[in-house]
Amino acid sequence: MVTMKDLLECGVHFGHQTRRWNPKMKKFIFGARKNIYIIDLQKTLRYFKYTYNVVRDAAAEGQTVLFVGTKKQARQAVKEHAERAGMPYVATRWLGGMLTNYPTMKKSIRKLEIIEQMEENGQLDMLTKKEALMLLRKKEKLSSYLEGFRYMKKLPDMMFVIDAVKENIAVKEARRLGMKVIAPLDTNCDPDVIDYPIPGNDDAIRSINLFCKEMADAIIEGKAAYAEANGGEAEEVPAGEMEAVMAEAATEETAAPATEAEVEKLVEEKAAPKAAAAEKKGDDLTKIAGVGKVYAGKLNDEGFYTFNDVANMTDEQINVMEEKYSFKGNFRDAVASAKELAEA
């Protein structure tokens, strides 16, 4: 269990600059030093211990906790401790709809399985060089996004998030589905959207690692109790071996051989956006504010060819474009620009 010394050594008490804060976090702030907010570690310790017990009890009931942390300084800790606890995670990029559109995500996982099987059994060699290259690129992309998430057999019961501000889409999806959300809250966060907040620094690597470690420890302790209650023994999985174990289980239990029809469909799906772009005469999307040649190509890949197409994008489509392709700036400004061009 975490101690006050651990919190101090990891710099959990350092918040953001005083000009960057959320007034709702006032109750967790001890004071300010040199324009930096100092978090009240007495409250942090109390909330930490309470949340530890909540997570431990959830794991003792067999519940699943999804770890989420995609910013650079969080990726390694999220991956390492989620694997250590045998829990799913997202550490590269949160794709809009990962939870709320889970059936579609399962289809993407199935596509990844098919391509991997084709590569293993030599089916890729039967395709043209261009088709094989397209599928290999698709595999690399899907593997990056779905690592840690692909072996999840059902929607998780809880979500543990590093940086609730950055991962706001993930938090919104979890809340929409009624999942409980756990998160360390820095001084710029909104505590109202988190079910189990732990006031603390969510930017420093040592602080992030401490949060992830403690949540993983709580899960491991809870899983041991679950195994004991169900007549089994808790099995410790050595670090680094979780991914291999999960991959083997997924291959044995969920992956079915790729059929010829599935292969043909996959090749057609990958080639379809470029074929459609060639057949359909669209507008010059580079005229849209903030959109260059590369991003215009990404819009075409997603099926948007004209100013009207972009102007009529739904909120969910906008979120997907922002998250999936890391648009520089506010993509809604680009949508507004497209609307002006369409009406001109």
Curated annotation (Swiss-Prot):
This is Small ribosomal subunit protein uS2. One of its GO terms (molecular function) is structural constituent of ribosome. Keywords: Ribonucleoprotein, Ribosomal protein. HAMAP family: Ribosomal_uS2_B. The keyword Ribosomal protein applies. Pfam families: Ribosomal_S2. One of its GO terms (cellular component) is cytosolic small ribosomal subunit. Belongs to the universal ribosomal protein uS2 family. InterPro entries: Ribosomal_uS2, Ribosomal_uS2_bac/mit/plastid, Ribosomal_uS2_CS, Ribosomal_uS2_flav_dom_sf. The keyword Ribosomal protein applies.
